[in-house]
Each structure stands twice: as structure tokens, then as C-alpha cells.
Regions:
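Extended alpha-helical scaffolds
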Residues: 6-148
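Accessory, solvent-exposed terminal regions and/or long lumenal/extracellular loops of proteins
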Residues: 169-171, 182, 187-205
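Structural detector for short beta-strands of small beta-barrel domains
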Residues: 146, 152-184
């Protein structure tokens, strides 16, 4: 009888533990929604700045304007948008280089950055609004999550069904890149799955 009572208590204790683990999900959902809304605010800022840049033209940016845009870059860090933040850093860097040497390559690179920022702002907004409409605000496998600066954890990849165990891989190539604007080194590894022929890459920052 004592053993049954003990077993019952252990079961109740275990169930209580499970319930305690489930409780934070509501907090996580609220935090996720709050973060998404903050990101949308950041996209509003990107829209205003990019529209201004397109209207005035990149070549008209002066020293004072560059300082203002650098302040905007810092602000983007408060909006959970590290992806667009790095892109904006690169845009400013290319403009500075263009003003120094007048090499049109830098100007074209700056334009490409601006185009990407506009695209991320529009598509990112649609993606984030769609995420808010979902009942489950878990991480999705949409690449826009990565474009906005999100980084998938191994546990999240597993939940998304993107984790593969016991895979036999061969490394096809390896390279290290350095982004002068963001001051970030990135190690890239390119792999092929021997069994499926699927090619993928890994990136370490």
C-alpha cells in the first residue's frame, strides 16, 4: 500500500513537473508577439529611410547625413533586426568608399544594398504580419526569418524536421569571408550527403 501511495505521489509530482514546464509557453508566445511587433516598428524605420534615400539619391549624402544614418544603424539593434542592420552598415560603408575614390563599383554596391533593404522591408513585413496571425507563434522555416537576422538553434531545427542524424557527409569546400562594413568573419562549409546527394552549407560567425 505504501508503495502504491509512493507511486501515486511520484506520478502526481511528475505531472506537476510537466505542467510547470508547459506554463512558460504562454510567456514565450507573448514575448514572441512583442518581439515581432517591435521588428515591424523597425521595418517602418527602414521604409522611411530607404524612401528618403531613393528620393534624394545616394550621391547627395553628405558627412552630416552619414552620421545620421549611422545613428539609424545603431537604432536597428533595438528592433531585433540584425540582418537589415548589417545590410545598412554595408550600404553606408560603400557610400563612404564611393565618396573617397569615386569608383562606381561602390555606388552600384550601395544601390544593391538599398534594393535588398527595400525587398526585406516589404517581404519581411508580410511575413511578420502572417506570423502574428498564427495561433502558434513558434519559429518557422521561412528564409525571411534568417534575412531579418534570426538564427536557428539545433533544437528549433529539430522541431521543424530539418535535423538529420547519422548522415554521411563529405565536405566539398570551405571558405572564410570578412565583411569590412560589419567587421564580421564568417566560415562557410559546403557539404554533400552521400546517400541522398543533397548539398547544404554551414556558416559560423
Amino acid at each position: 500500500k505504501k508503495e502504491k501511495t509512493k507511486a501515486k505521489k511520484e506520478k502526481e509530482s511528475a505531472e506537476g513537473t510537466v505542467k510547470e514546464k508547459k506554463a512558460p509557453s504562454k510567456v514565450s508566445k507573448a514575448a514572441r508577439a512583442k518581439k515581432i511587433n517591435k521588428q515591424i516598428e523597425g521595418l517602418d524605420l527602414i521604409k522611411n529611410i530607404s524612401t528618403q534615400l531613393l528620393k534624394l539619391g545616394l550621391s547627395t549624402i553628405g558627412t552630416v547625413s552619414l552620421k545620421e544614418y549611422k545613428d539609424v544603424v545603431k537604432q536597428l539593434g533595438d528592433y531585433y533586426l540584425p540582418g537589415p542592420q548589417i545590410l545598412f552598415q554595408k550600404l553606408i560603408f560603400e557610400i563612404q568608399e564611393y565618396k573617397e575614390d569615386q569608383d562606381t563599383v561602390h555606388y552600384q554596391q550601395a544601390l544593391e544594398c538599398l534594393k535588398r533593404l527595400r525587398a526585406i522591408e516589404k517581404k519581411g513585413r508580410e511575413y511578420l504580419n502572417a506570423e502574428l496571425e498564427k495561433e502558434n507563434l513558434g519559429i518557422s522555416d521561412n528564409t525571411l526569418y534568417e534575412d531579418l537576422g534570426g538564427v536557428w538553434k539545433l533544437e528549433q531545427l529539430n522541431d521543424l524536421g530539418l535535423k538529420k542524424e547519422n548522415a554521411r557527409l563529405i565536405q566539398l569546400a570551405f571558405e572564410v569571408t570578412y565583411d569590412e562594413a560589419s567587421k564580421i568573419f564568417t566560415d562557410y562549409g559546403y557539404w554533400i550527403d552521400i546517400d541522398s546527394g543533397e548539398i547544404s552549407y554551414t556558416a559560423n560567425y
